[in-house]
Amino acid sequence: MSLKRTRARERALQALYQIDVAAEGIDDALSRFWKSFEPVEREVMEDAEGFVRGVAAHRRTIDDTIEGVSTNWRLDRMAKVDRNVLRLAVYELLRTDVPVKVAINEAIELGKKYGSESSGAFVNGVLDKVAAGLPPERRRTDR
């Protein structure tokens, strides 16, 4: 796990949360978001923006995937932090360049850090179900 990628995920989650709360466009939200931070490493900022734009571009598929495995939980009823941790993680799970275990573990840590006491377990449960639906070659632990 790269520390820069971890920081990028953290910034992406914060930006996704802000976008969710403010219900505004990505460009305006990202511009305002970055102004609220001390200078951020270029690579971290680029990766974070890539995550945010990727989630936005695939949001319908991501949300459908989450709702498909979230028994008795609609997205609009989930805590905003949990919802956005899941969106970020599912985006990574649907890509092929991020190991499944890394995406899940990073999401669990984000849930624990920014969510409620039960967020880590909730995120883990949902993402385990999403991962179970991935093609077998994608689920391999050596990826």
UniProtKB/Swiss-Prot annotation:
Keyword Transcription regulation found: yes
Any one of the GO CC terms: cytosol
Keywords linked to the UniProt accession: RNA-binding, Transcription, Transcription antitermination, Transcription regulation
Family indicated by similarity: Belongs to the NusB family.
Matching InterPro entries: NusB-like_sf (IPR035926), NusB_fam (IPR011605), NusB_RsmB_TIM44 (IPR006027)
Name of the protein described by the UniProt record: Transcription antitermination protein NusB
Any one Gene Ontology BP term: DNA-templated transcription termination
Alphabetical list of Pfam families matching this protein: NusB
Top-level taxon of origin: Bacteria
SUPFAM superfamilies documented for this protein: NusB-like (SSF48013)
Role according to the record: Involved in transcription antitermination. Required for transcription of ribosomal RNA (rRNA) genes. Binds specifically to the boxA antiterminator sequence of the ribosomal RNA (rrn) operons.
NCBIfam families: nusB (TIGR01951)
The species this protein was found in: Anaeromyxobacter sp. (strain Fw109-5)
Keyword Mitochondrion: no
GO molecular function (one): RNA binding
Name of the coding gene: nusB
